[in-house]
Amino acid sequence: LISDRSEGFDMGCGSGRWARWMAEKVCTLNCIDPSDAIEISKNNLKNFKNINYFRASVDDDILLTASQDFGYSLGVLHHIPDTQAALSSCVKLLKPGAPFLVYLYYSFDNRSKLYSLIWKASDLIRKLIFNLPPFLKYWITDCIAIFIYYPLTRIVLAAERCGIDISNIPLSYYKDHSLYTMRTDARDRFGTPLEQRFSKVKIHNMMLEAGLDEIKFSSNAPFWCAVGYKK
């Protein structure tokens, strides 16, 4: 479905974290982001000649309807007030039969109540942090990554090597990830004004409503990642 002749889009590309991987595999990648991060993406991906950059939001109609061979939006649409409308805007850009990959924050529908309570406590912290001036917000989220995410993941990794089940420990997903990823995700998690969460069933229904079918969910963290194909 995706080849070196394909053209697609990265909706909410940020600093180009996923675009770096995808651009190597396709003919043209359209990176779209409404924030200053699009400039960071340009710098990070300057060696790629097959990327177009657009400072725009999901509903700005930057690309032609039904023009794209694939699309993805990873960890972005749950920060938009009307996530359903944003998802539908992405899908309308796809050609019939084209795949769309999405990652939306889960509502802990596959976790314990204690896990959910820990998140609620962290969400109170997020509501304090996102109102801070940008430089202070970035400094705090970097500190969270360096002094909370990273040490905890080292402990989790050691526990796993000792044969302990770590699947229900918060942040265990990051045990094999770089500090750069932790910094990026901490900023995404704590530095945004709106964070919505959805159950697997809800996401499935949203994707159907947006015009996708043959929907499949990943059984691995992070949750929920799903792919569907435009009808």
Predicted ranges, named:
Residues 2-7:
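Short helix-loop-beta connector
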Residues 9, 15-60:
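Class I SAM-dependent methyltransferase SAM/SAH-binding core
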Residues 60-71:
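A short acidic, Gly/Pro-enriched loop at the edge of an enzyme's catalytic core
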Residues 69-81:
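A short SAM/SAH-binding and catalytic strip from SAM-dependent methyltransferases
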Residues 84-96:
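A short glycine-rich, Lys/Arg-flanked "PGG" loop and its adjoining helix->strand segment in the class I
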Residues 99-131, 141:
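Conserved class I S-adenosyl-L-methionine
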Residues 122-199:
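C-terminal alpha-helical "lid/dimerization" subdomain adjacent to the S-adenosyl-L-methionine
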Residues 173-231:
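C-terminal lobe and adjacent flexible extensions of AdoMet/dcAdoMet transferase-like proteins
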